[in-house]
C-alpha cells in the first residue's frame, strides 16, 4: 500500500508539471487522494507464552478425535504454515528422503512455491498418517470422503472442543506462536524466520534470492523448534 501511495504522489507531481507547462489540462492522480486506504490487518488469536503453549501441546497430544484432525493438530505446530496449506497437504508434495514439503505456488498466498524443511518429529507424524491415508491424494482427508481434504474450519472447531476460545487460540495462531517464540529465542536470523513463514519480501530481486536463502539455517531451525516443542510439551520452561 505504501508503494501505491508513493506511485500516486509521483504521478501527481508529473501531471502538475504537465499542467504548469501546458502539456496537460488537469492532474487525474488527485482523484485518488484519500481513496487509497490501508486495509485493516486481521490479527489471529495465538498463545505466545511458552508454558501456556506447552499446555496446549499436551492437550493436543491427548486429543482423541478423527485421525485426520488429530494428526493435523499434531503437525501444525511443527511446520507453522497457513491453515489452508496444511489442510490441503498432498502426499505428492512430501519428500520423505529429502525431508521437505514443497507447497506448489497455486496453494500459496504469495503465488510462489514454498519449501518447508521437515524435522524428525514432523516426519514421524507424517509416517504414522501415511499408514492411514497414504493410498489417497490428501494427507488429511475428510471423514466424509477421501477425495477431499478436511474443511477450512476443522482445526478451529477442534480447538474449541479442547476448551480454547477464538480469543485464545486459532488455527492460524500456530504461525504467530512460532514467530514469537523463535524470535524471542534469539538463536535465529529474523529473515530466516520470515522465510519459513513464507512472508512477502519486498523487491523482485530480493524475492528471487530469498527463495533459496537461509535454507541450511531453516533446516537447523526446524529441528531445534521441534525439539523445543517436545521440551515444552513435557513441562519445560515452567
Specify the residue positions occupied by each region the protein language model found.
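Residue-level detection of the helix-turn-helix DNA-binding "recognition helix"
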Residues: 9, 16, 91, 184, ...
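Short, contiguous acidic/charged loop-to-helix segments that flank catalytic cores in large enzymes
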Residues: 43-45, 61-64, 105-115, 142-147, ...
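Catalytic-site neighborhood detector that most strongly recognizes the C-terminal catalytic loop/helix
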Residues: 47, 102-111, 123, 187, ...
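Short, basic (Lys/Arg/His-rich) helix/loop patches that form interaction surfaces
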Residues: 58-70, 79, 116, 124, ...
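Basic, Lys/Arg- and aromatic-enriched nucleic-acid-binding interface segment
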Residues: 1-12, 20-88, 97, 108-112, ...
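Residues in the recognition helix of alpha-helical DNA-binding motifs
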Residues: 7, 14, 89, 158, ...
Amino acid at each position: 500500500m505504501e508503494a501505491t501511495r508513493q506511485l500516486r504522489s509521483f504521478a501527481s507531481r508529473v501531471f502538475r508539471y504537465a499542467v504548469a507547462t501546458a502539456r496537460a489540462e488537469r492532474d487525474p492522480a488527485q482523484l485518488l487522494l484519500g481513496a487509497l486506504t490501508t486495509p485493516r490487518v486481521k490479527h489471529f488469536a495465538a498463545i505466545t507464552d511458552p508454558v501456556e503453549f506447552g499446555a496446549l501441546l499436551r492437550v493436543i497430544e491427548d486429543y482423541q478425535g478423527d485421525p485426520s484432525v488429530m494428526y493435523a493438530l499434531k503437525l501444525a505446530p511443527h511446520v507453522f504454515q497457513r491453515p489452508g496449506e496444511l489442510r490441503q497437504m498432498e502426499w505428492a508434495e512430501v519428500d520423505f528422503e529429502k525431508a521437505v514439503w514443497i507447497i506448489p505456488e497455486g496453494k500459496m498466498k504469495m503465488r510462489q512455491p514454498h519449501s518447508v524443511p521437515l524435522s524428525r518429529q514432523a516426519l514421524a507424524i507424517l509416517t504414522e498418517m501415511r499408514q492411514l491415508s497414504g493410498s489417497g491424494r490428501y494427507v488429511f482427508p475428510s471423514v466424509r470422503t477421501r477425495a477431499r481434504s478436511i474443511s477450512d474450519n476443522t482445526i478451529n472447531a477442534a480447538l474449541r472442543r479442547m476448551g480454547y476460545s477464538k480469543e485464545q487460540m486459532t488455527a492460524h495462531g500456530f504461525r504467530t506462536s512460532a514467530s514469537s517464540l523463535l524470535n524471542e529465542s534469539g538463536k535465529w536470523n529474523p529473515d530466516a524466520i520470515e522465510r519459513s513463514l513464507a512472508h512477502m519480501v519486498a523487491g523482485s530481486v530480493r524475492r528471487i534470492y530469498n527463495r533459496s536463502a537461509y535454507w541450511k539455517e531453516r533446516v537447523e531451525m526446524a529441528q531445534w523448534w521441534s525439539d523445543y516443542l517436545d521440551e515444552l510439551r513435557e513441562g519445560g520452561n515452567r
